[in-house]
């Protein structure tokens, strides 16, 4: 008994010593060369310090196209640590629809952040309900909304809904998806399975089975893959963003809708990048005539909250009636802060006068590009647009040099493949700012063509 008590006391003493040996007032031990690096946000010569630290603490998953560290933005302009300003024709890849630090947007963020930012979906919140009301009121096709946090999540939810309905109605074999060449649906496992580019897919196999790729705008290739007993959904971008701004034709989409209807499968339109005013229409799919092409599901994200993370899935009653509590969910989706901001952005963009301006500025940009094509027909091979401020130009060479040249002239543009430049500026961009872009493009083309002589 005495020995047992002695052992217990020894253990207690060791435990107590280990506690009291900790000096809680001392500074934590940090990794050398990481957290002891002194950074100064106001130092105009501090760009390299931030980039060096970035390389040490942030995973290398992005090929950064520049050595710029941005500090703030206003409207169509971004400002870096050195004090230089850049005209932004990428808008965060079609996200900042109202530009950077829009006054009304900033006011809504500030006001809502003082009230309620996050709640969870165990409870109701006013902004989510009001945003859903605005969105559903704007379309005759869709009846319910599911909120997510990104385009990938929106597409993932859409695919899950389609699979559940397909299996419930057609048995375990009716789970297959048809996607399209050059399409981009996202990077999570389900949406990645519907993304065509092999460099995104091949290192993560095996992916979700039963996904087949048809040729974009080729209805015969879809027919070869379609099966009434196996296909549960077709997912398609009305305008492909990553795929070089190729647009689906009206005839193809109407035939696709008819084919889906005949085979009892759902039609999903992915408007993550091309929706909410980007094409000059509120919804990109309305170009196909909603009487002859009536999608069952539409996914949205990028511009909806003007820079805050949000995604949305709009569905018909036919779909909504099959989805029950527990079939899908999200912790952050539909939060009061992002939905209040989304409500402001959506109601602003959906105004007819706003959309008319987008159409006019899109035409102004396209007309300017056509003039350049007339001047340099061997350099600009094609101009791609269905309207609005979502315009691509295909060049006869790799566009990386143009991206670098434009950056040197303080204009930011982004590619959509090796030979296509994608222009998706803030929808609030001015014609004077478009002129600045056109001048830089002209100077670049003069330079390229003089080097060919």
Curated annotation (Swiss-Prot):
E.C. designation(s): 2.6.1.11
CDD domains hit by this protein: OAT_like (cd00610)
GO molecular-function term, one example from the UniProt record: N2-acetyl-L-ornithine:2-oxoglutarate 5-aminotransferase activity
Family from the record: Belongs to the class-III pyridoxal-phosphate-dependent aminotransferase family.
Subcellular location per the Swiss-Prot or TrEMBL entry: Mitochondrion matrix
Name listed for the protein in its UniProt record: Probable acetylornithine aminotransferase, mitochondrial
Major location (coarse): mitochondrion
Cofactor needs: pyridoxal 5'-phosphate
Keywords tagged on the record: Amino-acid biosynthesis, Aminotransferase, Arginine biosynthesis, Mitochondrion, Pyridoxal phosphate, Transferase, Transit peptide
Top-level EC class as recorded in UniProt: transferase
Pathway connected to this protein: Amino-acid biosynthesis; L-arginine biosynthesis; N(2)-acetyl-L-ornithine from L-glutamate: step 4/4
Database matches in Pfam families: Aminotran_3
Reaction(s) the record says it catalyses: N(2)-acetyl-L-ornithine + 2-oxoglutarate = N-acetyl-L-glutamate 5-semialdehyde + L-glutamate
Organism phylogeny: Eukaryota, Amoebozoa, Evosea, Eumycetozoa, Dictyostelia
GO biological process: L-arginine biosynthetic process
Originating species: Dictyostelium discoideum (Social amoeba)
GO cellular component, one term: mitochondrial matrix
NCBIfam families given in the database record: argD (TIGR00707), PRK01278.1 (NF002325)
Annotated positions of the N6-(pyridoxal phosphate)lysine modification: 302
